[in-house]
């Protein structure tokens, strides 16, 4: 085996490691969202605190993936699609780390809400969380499989969670107007809804970057998601 062939195999192995690490981090972040919402719905402070404690694992993985990306850039000087893949990996981990932080924020609000009587049945927020988690999962699947169509589907679904947020906002405003003693609880629920909306935004960011990685075209800041690229 000559040196070039050995180097190419090592490079391919590092690219594979990068993909696996990003998937692992994405799976952990998805679990963090799931546990945060369970802590809210089940009024389980212990689950919320355990989720907050696990955030350091997400942060550590963020650093590890950054190191892999920077090593690939420095040692192999990739070009074209590989360069886009590695720089996208750097950006994806930033979004995943922020989603992890948002899961912590949800837990903090849930612990506060758990100290008071439940304001309303939890129907809207678990549904929003399910949409956000699905968007995140699909964006990571699109990354691994270089699936542009799936990435575009994620971008389109961002409107769904925006509509659910607006619907919940109107309902909670009615609660606050009719019963001022509910204001604090309603505001905390609104915060959680906005957190979930931000998770969906981060999933959309990931999906947009995948389109750029595969096609070399940016769809960011377009008024409408294109039917194809």
Regions found by a protein language model. Give the residues of each.
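Cytosolic, long alpha-helical scaffolding segments
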Residues: 1-229
């Amino acid at each position: 085996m000559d040196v070039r062939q050995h180097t190419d195999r090592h490079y391919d192995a590092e690219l594979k490691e990068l993909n696996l690490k990003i998937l692992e981090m994405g799976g952990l972040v998805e679990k963090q969202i799931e546990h945060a919402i369970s802590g809210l719905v089940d009024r389980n402070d212990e689950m919320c605190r355990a989720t907050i404690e696990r955030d350091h694992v997400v942060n550590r993985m963020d650093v590890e993936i950054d190191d892999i990306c920077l090593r690939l850039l420095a040692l192999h000087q990739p070009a074209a699609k590989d360069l886009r893949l590695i720089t996208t990996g750097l950006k994806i981990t930033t979004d995943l780390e922020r989603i992890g932080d948002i899961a912590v924020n949800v837990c903090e609000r849930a612990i506060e809400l758990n100290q008071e009587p439940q304001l309303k049945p939890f129907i809207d927020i678990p549904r929003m969380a399910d949409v956000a988690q699905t968007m995140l999962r699909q964006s990571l699947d699109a990354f691994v499989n270089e699936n542009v169509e799936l990435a575009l589907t994620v971008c389109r679904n961002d409107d769904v969670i925006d509509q659910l947020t607006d619907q919940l906002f109107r309902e909670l405003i009615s609660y606050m107007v009719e019963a001022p003693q509910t204001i604090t609880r309603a505001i905390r629920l609104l915060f959680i809804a906005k957190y979930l909306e931000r998770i969906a935004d981060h999933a959309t960011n990931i999906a947009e970057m995948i389109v750029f990685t595969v096609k070399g075209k940016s769809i960011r800041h377009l008024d409408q998601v294109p039917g194809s690229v």
